[in-house]
Structures are given as structure tokens and as C-alpha cells.
């Protein structure tokens, strides 16, 4: 039984395939599972059509088709997402339904970079996918060595354009279809080569417990003689009794507080950590001075902001979204973590309106400050129904 225990101790990394339609993302996903199974005896081989018929999931009220497969290398355990359609990628990346620690950009060597190749790189930059490795696919169809080099250069240029280190990014040339047919052969070697690159290029993600403490406030009440309690689920980090933390959001400046107790299931703890549903007892604040929508966080780790750039997906009518476009100056509610805040939208130069089903970069200004940082997800709502999803791309003020 020693083996199973060892498997669990491998670092876990989330990755996904991105790239233009028909460049071979799903074929590569299938080829990876079969090659890994063939070479390492780990994971199950998953057939192409199983991945292609991805089940629908709902994330923040949005239906997304996503296929999930798992496999292992010598060093790591990987969870891999693949989406059947371009729209599914856009929704997936913006809602963070499948958070990626890194991505495999699949580009057909026979076609070179195409519009969605570029769009997926841009989306990766906007939503904070930190690392990309390139798999030039269908190399069996290209006899001309110079053509391969040309495509590789084009992809590297694209990566540089969107602030990824294009010159240093690993680029592996292979054929997913050939690896699928013969995982033990030379094309299978290319899949192994791809994962040697991924194992080294995509670093191990920082565990949630190692990040700075943050807990969105869900509810507040006072305990006579003991003080004010804020309840919620700790999103990341660790909070200890007697520690000084900050209350952030809905006011201009964060307010410093001291934790006098942490409770979980009516038991007192020395500390709470990521994933725990806790009540945090606070000294020096009245019940009416803290509210849902604020966060408790490690002092200095997050600031309140009102203005930022965001990447937004607008729901289609069929998804329960708006039936009509919206224009510059549109004022919906923005739902962050636990609360709605009104704000207004500024569209990019030359964009007149946004149609249901579009994805777009926009500037958002909120009427009250919210604890915000790059990568924070939010929903856009009108009268309580979700009409869009977004992610903070960069802070303005």
C-alpha cells in the first residue's frame, strides 16, 4: 500500500489546453492521457470522443462545457481541462471555473497562429494564467524545416506581444494524432518531452495556506462581554489569535483590528486556515462598524479600490442574460465575493456597444471602494440576475 500514499504526496498542478479551433487541443489531451498511461502506468487512457463530449457545468450562473482529465508524470500529479468550443474557453477563463497554474498553447504547424491563438494568449494575460508552454502540433504534415522555424518564431512573437517571455518559452514540435496512434513510438517521446518542459517551466503553485490571510465577511454579530464576531469562509492564508489584521473595503482606508479569538463549530481554536468556516472575534470595533462586503485580511496585503480594467463576458439571451446590447456609461451592480456594489462601465475607444455573447476589456468605476486585486472574479448583475462575468485585469486607482 506504500505506493498509493506516495502518489498523494506528489505536488498537484492545474493545467489546460488553449489555442485555435481544430489545431488539435482535444487530440493532444487524449494523446497525453494515453502516453502517460503507456509510459508510467498512471492515470487512465481517455479516448478523444469522451473528452469531446464534455459535460456542461454551471459556474456563477453560466453554463460551460469542460472536460477534466487527470494524469501523472514522475514528479507531479496534473489535473487538465479542455473545452470543446471557443466560447467555453472565454467563459472558463473569465469565470475562473477552471483555474490554471499554466497552459499548453496548441498551434498547428500546418496553419500557424490564427485569431483564437492570439485571443487565448491575450485572455491568459488578462485573467492571470501565469505560464504558457507551446506544443506545435501536426508537425508530421510539414516537411519543410524552415516553415516549422517560421511558425515557431511567429508564436514566440505573439507571446512577447502579450508580455509572456516568448524567447525563453519551451516550444515542443510533435503530432498529437501520431502519438495517439503509437504512444510508445517517437511521437510519444514528444509528449514526454512536452511534460519534461512543463514540469520545469510551470512552477509548483503556492498553496492557499501559504498566501496572505483573507476572509470575506458574510455575517456580523456581537457577543455580550466578548465583542464583535465576523463570520465567513477563509479564502486563503492563516489567521492566529492575538494577530493584528485589517478590515478592508466600503471605506476609504483599511482599519486595523486585533483578533481575540477564532471559533469553528463552537470550538475555540488558536488559528483558522484556508477553507475553514469560522467566526473571528475582534477587539475594538462595534457591530455596526463592520458589514458584509468587507474583507478581513493580512495588513497591507490588499487595498480598497474603485477603478480598474476588467475582462468581461456578457451572457447571451439563451443563458439568461440581457436581450439587448448595453452602451458606454451602463450602470449595473457588480457582485464581489459577498455583496453587490453599483458601478459604471467605460467602453474602449471605438466600441459603440456590447452585445450579449461578447467578451470585452472595459474600465469599471465603483461607487464604493472594494478590496480588489488582479485576478479577482466578479459577476455583473441587474436586479439580482447575472448578466455577465468578469475578472480584474489591472488596478487604476
From Swiss-Prot:
GO terms for cellular component: cytosol. It is found in: Cytoplasm. GTP hydrolase that promotes the GTP-dependent binding of aminoacyl-tRNA to the A-site of ribosomes during protein biosynthesis. Monomer. This is Elongation factor Tu 2. Its main location: cytoplasm. Residues 10-206 form the tr-type G domain. Residues 137-140 are annotated as: G4. Transmembrane segments: none annotated. GTP binds at residues 19-26, 82-86, 137-140. GO terms for molecular function: GTP binding; GTPase activity; translation elongation factor activity. It catalyses: GTP + H2O = GDP + phosphate + H(+). It comes from Alkaliphilus metalliredigens (strain QYMF). Belongs to the TRAFAC class translation factor GTPase superfamily. Classic translation factor GTPase family. EF-Tu/EF-1A subfamily. Residues 175-177 are annotated as: G5. Residues 61-65 are annotated as: G2. HAMAP family: EF_Tu_B. Pfam families: GTP_EFTU (PF00009), GTP_EFTU_D2 (PF03144), GTP_EFTU_D3 (PF03143). Mg(2+) binds at residue 26. Residues 82-85 are annotated as: G3. Keywords: Cytoplasm, Elongation factor, GTP-binding, Hydrolase, Magnesium, Metal-binding, Nucleotide-binding, Protein biosynthesis.
Amino acid at each position: 500500500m506504500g505506493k498509493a500514499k506516495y502518489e498523494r504526496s506528489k505536488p498537484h498542478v492545474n493545467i489546460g489546453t488553449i489555442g485555435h479551433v481544430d489545431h488539435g487541443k482535444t487530440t493532444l489531451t487524449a494523446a497525453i492521457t494515453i502516453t502517460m498511461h503507456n509510459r508510467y502506468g498512471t492515470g487512465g487512457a481517455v479516448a478523444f470522443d469522451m473528452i469531446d463530449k464534455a459535460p456542461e457545468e454551471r459556474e456563477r450562473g453560466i453554463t460551460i462545457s469542460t472536460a477534466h482529465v487527470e494524469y501523472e508524470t514522475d514528479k507531479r500529479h496534473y489535473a487538465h481541462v479542455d473545452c470543446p468550443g471557443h466560447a467555453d474557453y472565454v467563459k472558463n477563463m473569465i469565470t475562473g471555473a477552471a483555474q490554471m497554474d499554466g497552459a499548453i498553447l496548441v498551434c498547428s504547424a500546418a496553419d500557424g497562429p490564427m485569431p483564437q491563438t492570439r485571443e487565448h494568449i491575450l485572455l491568459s494575460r488578462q485573467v492571470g494564467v501565469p505560464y504558457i508552454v507551446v506544443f506545435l502540433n501536426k508537425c508530421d504534415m510539414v516537411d519543410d524545416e524552415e516553415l516549422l522555424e517560421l511558425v515557431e518564431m511567429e508564436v514566440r512573437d505573439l507571446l512577447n506581444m502579450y508580455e509572456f517571455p516568448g524567447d525563453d518559452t519551451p516550444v515542443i514540435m510533435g503530432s498529437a494524432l501520431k502519438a495517439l496512434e503509437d504512444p510508445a513510438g517517437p511521437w510519444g517521446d514528444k509528449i514526454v518531452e512536452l511534460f519534461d518542459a512543463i514540469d520545469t517551466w510551470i512552477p509548483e503553485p503556492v498553496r492557499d495556506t501559504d498566501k496572505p490571510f483573507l476572509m470575506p465577511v458574510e455575517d456580523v454579530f456581537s457577543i455580550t462581554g466578548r465583542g464583535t464576531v465576523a463570520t465567513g469562509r477563509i479564502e486563503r492564508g492563516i489567521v492566529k489569535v492575538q494577530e493584528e489584521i485589517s478590515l478592508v473595503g466600503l471605506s476609504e482606508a483599511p482599519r486595523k483590528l486585533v483578533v481575540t479569538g477564532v471559533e469553528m463549530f463552537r470550538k475555540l481554536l488558536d488559528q483558522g486556515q484556508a477553507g475553514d468556516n469560522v467566526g473571528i472575534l475582534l477587539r475594538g470595533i462595534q457591530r455596526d462598524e463592520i458589514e458584509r462586503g468587507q474583507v478581513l485580511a493580512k495588513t497591507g496585503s490588499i487595498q480598497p479600490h474603485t477603478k480598474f480594467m476588467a475582462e468581461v463576458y456578457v451572457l447571451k439571451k439563451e443563458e439568461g442574460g440581457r436581450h439587448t446590447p448595453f452602451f458606454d456609461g451602463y450602470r449595473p451592480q457588480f457582485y464581489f465575493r459577498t455583496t453587490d456594489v453599483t458601478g459604471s462601465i467605460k467602453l474602449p475607444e471605438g466600441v459603440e456597444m456590447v452585445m450579449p455573447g461578447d467578451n470585452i476589456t472595459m474600465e469599471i468605476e465603483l461607487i464604493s471602494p472594494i478590496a480588489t486585486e488582479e485576478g479577482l472574479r466578479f459577476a455583473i448583475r441587474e436586479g439580482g440576475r447575472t448578466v455577465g462575468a468578469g475578472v480584474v485585469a489591472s488596478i487604476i486607482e
